[in-house]
Amino acid sequence: MHDFTYYAQILISGLTIGSLYALIAIGYTMVYGILRLINFAHGDMFMVAGFIMIYITSWSSSFLGAGSIAVGLILTLILTVVLGVMIEKVAYKPLRQAPRMSDMISAIGVSYLMQNLATYDTGGLAQAYPNIPWLRKEIALGSITVKRLAILTPLLTILLVVALVLIIKHTKMGMAMRAVAKDFDTAQLMGIRIDRVISITFVIGSLLAAVGSILYFSYIGQVSPTIGSMPGLKSFVAAVFGGIGSVPGAVIGSYIIGICETFIKSNQDISIFSNAFTFALLIVILLIKPNGLFGEKLKEKV
């Protein structure tokens, strides 16, 4: 019989993993809400952000010392955003008038391109992620001892989600995003700068992926060329579970998956099924509620 401390540790771990999934899932759901595109390259953006951090800190540590971590954090955020916007301009924008399948194939192509470039550069080997000492320190919460990272991750995620919701609900750009998500063609006819809205959507999604990358790889300690695939897929499932196109839905779906997955992993008899559970959940949700928990039914134009 397990005690309270055992279940509390699992719950905290589940909230941490769920928060990391949420930061990625928001990128999926925002891009889909605006472009009706499943950006399958998003998980690999997360992976690339990890390698950016590794390379920048390695390059700058010889002349900046401990300051290389701060420089690495800032440049990782900036360069990941730049990469995200470049991918949209090169791989997605030229295909806006093409059949929807073309966008999806392009996204899959970008995903494999990033994985193969990373594999070529690293030889397919995992690279150690820079140690951020402040995040690794442990703190006591009553009878429970956890790393600061486990407390910071959910708090930072909630703060970022609240800020994002406020931007979407109460700013001119947020209003433009909602208009484009509601009716792309009408928004364009009304004079809304579609390209600007789409670019900002990719900026937000890429920025959140970079933040998630920093937290996730600080948590597991290493980056490999294919490591973005599974978190990316699980975050996509979370977005569908909550109702793709809904930011709150993506967050709630992420926490449900993160907590359930952690409980399954904690049981040695069924831990091998932790990944299978996520995708089984997707099948069940699509059968029972195809639009997810908070998704709206969309009418396709013909």
Model-predicted regions and their roles:
Residues 12, 34-37, 41-86, 90, ...:
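Membrane-embedded helix boundary and interhelical linker motif in transport proteins
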Residues 94-95, 100-170, 197-200, 263-276, ...:
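Transmembrane helix-bundle core of multi-pass membrane transporters
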Residues 28-51, 97-102, 173-176, 194, ...:
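Short, non-helical or kinked segments that cap or interrupt transmembrane helices
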Residues 33-41, 82-125, 167-174, 179, ...:
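Short loop segments and helix-boundary regions at transmembrane helix junctions
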Residues 23, 68-77, 202-209, 219-280:
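Transmembrane alpha-helical segments in multi-pass inner-membrane proteins
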Residues 63-110, 252-257, 289:
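Alpha-helical transmembrane segments within multi-pass membrane transporters and channels
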Residues 1-24, 52, 63-71, 98-102, ...:
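Membrane-interfacial amphipathic/re-entrant helices at transmembrane-helix boundaries
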Residues 17, 145-223, 247-252:
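Helix-loop-helix "hairpin" substructures at the membrane interface of multi-pass membrane proteins
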